Amino acid sequence: MKRSEKRILTTHVGSLVRPPELSRYIEAIDNGVKVDQAAFDRSLADSVADVIKRQQQVGVDIVSDGEFGKFRSWSFYVLDRLGGIEERAVEAARGAGRDQQMFADFYAEYFPTQKLPKRGTVVCVGPLTYKGHAAVRKDIEIFKAGLKGAAVADAFLPVVAPASAVPRHKNEYYKDDEEFLFKLAEALREEYKAIVDAGLMVQIDDAFLPYMYDVAFAVDQLTISEVGGGPHRGAQSRHRRLAGRPHPLSHLLGQL
């Protein structure tokens, strides 16, 4: 990570608004529609190069790829990069969290605008492994190609934290959820390593951290002390993922 003694270097959380053409491709992919792969790859590469230039133009020092290559959303993209899991038919929802209950009118208007594809229930059925080497390599190559000639201080790729990767899952293989979470951390560490080894910063997004409290209080009626174990295990799993990684090349983001 670059340091500055003259001023504070600027950055952002990582995700940026996708251009319309790229959004149409990703919406089609998310809904299982076959697209022209070569045309999509060109659109993705052009979009990443353009968003890097736009960040530079507005004065952002530490830029990202906008998370443009994460098709299934900022967290669900990783499901295509993991072995040992499968998706099954959607089960009944657990219920709305406290925030959704308090602002029901807002969410009633918000959700229909998001065009979210239907998600199945994520089930762990075997040993968790990482199989996304080609995908993360593509992320890196497209990002680094877009960075050529860019006058920026540094660059980072956002990735999902273990606890946020599959926040609503069923575990049918490991002895308990704690073992599941730590095995997931070990698998996802390979994605971290690939990014850091490529000379880029890696950002860990754990946006489901506040959601854990929101749902636990409103739906499960748990106390603060009872909820605390989940975030604590999530933090431990992140540290395990970072084992052997240079700390200056990584940072944690809990989006509130």
Regions found by a protein language model. Name each.
Residues M1-L256:
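Domain-level signal for soluble alpha/beta catalytic cores
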